[in-house]
Amino acid sequence: MLTRRQAFIALTAGMAACGEPSGADAPPAGSLGWALGGPWRMAPERDQWRHPLQTLLFWGLQGEMTVLEILPGLGWYTSILAPYLAANGGRLIAAGFDPRGGTMAQREVLAAWEARFTHEPELYGSIQRTVVSAQGGALAPPGSVDLAILANNVHTLMADGIAERVFGEVLAALKPSGALGVEQHRAASTGLQDPLAGAGYVQEAYVKALAQEAGFEFVAASDVNANPRDTRDHPFGVWTLPPTLRTSALGQPDDPSFDTAPFEAIGESDRMTLKFRKPSGPARTPAATPNSSP
């Protein structure tokens, strides 16, 4: 059941989604509805697939929190989180790609994020930036974070071979009882998990085991971002689907003859939405990670 505060946020966000409210109908400045309805939003048309209001409420977001966003990409969630937290006395820490390492594509993503979010402090606040690097390191001061968010990037950590370590670094950054919210393209529950997640999909049990092995407690799962039309069997992995609509293998020229219509009809991927918590007491014995293919 929603709290009174969550119900109010949901109401104001719903008004924001109904068009251009004016006067008394406009969401209050600084509310989550205001942040969701702002003209600064990145690709708000994706809300029908990613359900940011329901997802953020499920994870427990509040305006005064310190939030750690791991690998924010181009900033789809940053464009919601940064204004909302800045308006309410909260703080956003963005742990992005290492500008001194990684791939050219990762550096280009980082540069695009920086160009968008580092020049308007009156809107986005002063976002603290840290690095997710191959060498490891603190993502935030130990025990300083209320909520950490991993949105559609567990597969990236797996591809780089650093998923287990980063989950541990997130745990260290969180306050006792702090939460970790995960959104991730969901693989079929049968078969072996590709340890590099080459198609972008990860089994839900595998993500849970990664978190529990790091010391997290599982809290709850939501199907708010589920898409039963996603068969997961696409020629270019999850990137065959919107919003990417890839038409050729990575590194190859686009294929203008490739028919994207069937994949547009599917919509964005089927996704798990999970919530974990850092224990408030002594850490539990880690769980074993499920089998993966060699």
Segments the model singles out, each with a brief description of its role:
Residues 260-294:
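C-terminal lobe and adjacent flexible extensions of AdoMet/dcAdoMet transferase-like proteins
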Residues 164-176:
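A short glycine-rich, Lys/Arg-flanked "PGG" loop and its adjoining helix->strand segment in the class I
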